[in-house]
Amino acid sequence: MRLEYTDRFQRAYNDLTDRDAERVKKALRLLVENPRHPSLRVKRMQGTDQIWEAGASLSIRLTFEIHGDLIVLRNVGAHDETLKKP
């Protein structure tokens, strides 16, 4: 799997604390290796066909789309805030 970052994801990632950024990096490594890894808690977002969510921690979520072998990262940040604007 390959990763592609949207501008919004990049801006949100840059706003994370160093600790949260490290958690996201670890989650992205797992996502590339095995998108169904249990620690990521990956699930399709309600009301969407193509947007998925995964957890970098209990409080940090990231949203993405999968197109073949490409994962397009859409947003990252605090759980509730990120899921309101996937």
Predicted regions and their residues:
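A short, surface-exposed loop/turn module that caps and links secondary-structure elements
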Residues: 29-55
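Enriched for short, Lys/Arg-rich terminal
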Residues: 2, 7-11, 15-22, 55-86
